Amino acid sequence: MKHNLQDNLQGEQMANTNSNGGKKPFSDAKIIERANLLRDNDLYFFFRAIEETEASTVTVKGKKQIMIGSNNYLGLTHHPAVKEAAIKAVEKYGTGCTGSRFLNGNLNIHEELDEKLAAYLGHEKAIVFSTGMQANLGALSAICGPKDLMLFDSENHASIIDASRLSLGTTFKYKHNDMASLEELLESNMSRFNRVIIVADGVFSMTGDILRLPEVVKLAKKYGAYVYVDDAHGLGVMGPQGRGTMAHFDVTKDVDFNMGTFSKSFASIGGVISGSKDAIDYVRHSARSFMFSASMPPAAVATVSACIDVVQNDETILNNLWSNVEFMRNGFKELGFFTYGSQTPIIPLFIGDDMKALKMTKWLESKGVFCTPVLPPAVPKGETLIRTSYMASHNREDLSTVLEVFAEAKKIFDIPNHLH
């Protein structure tokens, strides 16, 4: 049954018309109602099957598209040295580890990667998890106990929100990148808890803005709090040789825990937590998502190691990335798009209206541009955007084409130049 998309896109609850023998059917769930509305109107842009990938293009439904929705910032998924390392690892170790690192799934290359990442990030120790999500879930739920407090930015990643729910500690949000809001919570709560941990993204995934990390560090020192940075979108991109947001601000020694993922710049899957020797040893023996999950597959481990080598030895990769970012940022500015002041490879484009964003995404796809609409609740109501992101492997011809297509789209869909 088709419903009115405009009236129901925000997720109003539909009536339950199927008793299903007394069991409430999942088809009546609000999220399924919304998904069906999008499907009915041919505006469902989730789970798009990508049939082939190249340096910065993908094939969907037999049609090649310029990919500007990927987190493959360094463009290393097709780098010859990276692919060769993955293949050699499979030949030596097989396709999987079939066990937890805690027991039978700990390969020597896992430990070598731990050490390599610790040196790369500038911390005493590091430990590799199977995914970035598991790294946050495991580490945060381990270090925030019943007598502890977690203070986190209101725009943090979902994994931090879920970790706060898993932890036995108390959790409070502070306003996004608002140091006055953070200090108010620190001042009123420090004496009530054993440990206080400030948790924030290094680069925020939707708007691409950067954590005011030096100010966070200053407040942490003033009040005696720990600092935990989720640098999923900063690792490999920010700072010298892509060492991350804490290196970008030269505050590595002041960050107690640094988390990174390998599913973005490092062309693989997995996550890492780095910090002091004692802190990481504690996480190693306490993080349930680490202890009770099978370890990273050998090919994934070798891929990450090779990516670190590439970014450390070939400065043209980061130079190309930032050149492309500057080109697109200036291009969108000239076209009159509001980009939230982003200074990273994530360049969000304010659209405002949900329907307009969905229809524009469909139109862009028809013109050979793959991008991602971001709707509430991922962003505040009325601030729907199209999230674009850029890679070192993009060529200038494709990026110029993207700008030409967006120039036409802005006129067709009457996109505003600023937030309402």
Curated annotation (Swiss-Prot):
Entry keyword annotation includes Cell inner membrane: yes
**Entry EC no(s):** 2.3.1.50
**Involved pathway(s):** Lipid metabolism; sphingolipid metabolism
The coiled-coil segments of this chain are: none
Q: Where in the cell is it found?
A: Cytoplasm; Cell inner membrane
Cofactor(s) the record lists: pyridoxal 5'-phosphate
pH dependence of activity:
Optimum pH is 7.0 to 8.0.
Q: Where is this region: Disordered?
A: 1-25
Q: Name one GO biological process term.
A: biosynthetic process
- Entry keyword annotation includes Cytoplasm: yes
Q: Name one GO cellular component term.
A: plasma membrane
A GO molecular-function term, please?
pyridoxal phosphate binding
InterPro entries xref list: Aminotrans_II_pyridoxalP_BS, Aminotransferase_I/II_large, AON_synthase_class-II, PyrdxlP-dep_Trfase, PyrdxlP-dep_Trfase_major, PyrdxlP-dep_Trfase_small
Here the segments flagged for biased composition (Polar residues) are 1-21
Q: Which residues carry this modification: N6-(pyridoxal phosphate)lysine?
A: 264
Sorted alphabetically, which keywords does the UniProt record give?
Acyltransferase, Cell inner membrane, Cell membrane, Cytoplasm, Lipid metabolism, Membrane, Pyridoxal phosphate, Transferase
Q: What topology does it adopt in the membrane?
A: Peripheral membrane protein
Q: What class of enzyme is it?
A: transferase
Residues bound to pyridoxal 5'-phosphate: 132-133, 233, 261, 263
* Mechanisms controlling activity: Significantly inhibited by palmitoyl-CoA concentrations greater than 100 uM.
State the reactions this protein catalyses.
L-serine + hexadecanoyl-CoA + H(+) = 3-oxosphinganine + CO2 + CoA
Query: What protein family does this chain belong to?
Result: Belongs to the class-II pyridoxal-phosphate-dependent aminotransferase family.
Q: Can you state the subunit structure given in the record?
A: Homodimer.
This chain's function reads: Catalyzes the condensation of L-serine with palmitoyl-CoA (hexadecanoyl-CoA) to produce 3-oxosphinganine.
The protein's name is Serine palmitoyltransferase
Organism equals Bacteriovorax stolpii (Bdellovibrio stolpii)
Recall the taxonomic lineage recorded for the source organism.
Bacteria, Pseudomonadati, Bdellovibrionota, Bacteriovoracia, Bacteriovoracales
The encoding gene is spt
